[in-house]
């Protein structure tokens, strides 16, 4: 099989370790290039690695196949003795994926917009054709999660957007 350019498949901020191309899916093993992370409680940057674990993230399809990111994530020890957070997991950043997400931010955004534009069943039907197998309920949950209510101010006018 010829070499495939995986650059566009990988969200920025991740480095490709290996690529497995199957008949139905492309699996990219990725990791963050830096081996340090800031403690979410105190903000001190730590390089003291505690352990590592694997996360699996679904991403946008490519070349007629599903794309799965197998991410090597790390846990670090906080180096501030007074911090109550002794061990923490590195944050990927909202441009890659949210804390406990199983989909990348760009796939989640596409699913959100499909659900917003078409609603439950029509969006689920189109998403299957686009190789994004999500249920109508997942589409509607994603729309609700992204929905931000704008509360009127005390004067009765909506806040500026």
Model-predicted regions and their roles:
Residues 46, 54-160:
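Short, positively charged, Gly/Tyr-enriched micro-motifs
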């Amino acid at each position: 099989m010829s070499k495939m350019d995986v650059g566009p498949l990988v969200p920025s901020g991740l480095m490709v370790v290996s690529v497995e191309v199957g008949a139905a899916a492309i699996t990219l093993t990725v990791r963050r290039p830096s081996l340090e992370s800031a403690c979410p409680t105190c903000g001190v940057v730590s390089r003291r690695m505690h352990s590592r674990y694997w996360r699996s993230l679904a991403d946008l399809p490519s070349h007629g196949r599903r794309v799965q990111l197998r991410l090597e994530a790390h846990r670090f020890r906080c180096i501030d003795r007074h911090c109550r957070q002794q061990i923490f997991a590195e944050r990927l950043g909202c441009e890659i994926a949210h804390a406990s997400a199983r989909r990348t931010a760009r796939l989640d955004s596409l699913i959100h917009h499909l659900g917003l534009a078409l609603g439950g069943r029509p969006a689920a039907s189109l998403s299957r054709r686009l190789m994004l197998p999500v249920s109508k309920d997942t589409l509607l949950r994603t729309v609700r999660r992204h929905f931000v209510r704008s509360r009127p101010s005390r004067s009765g006018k909506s806040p500026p957007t």
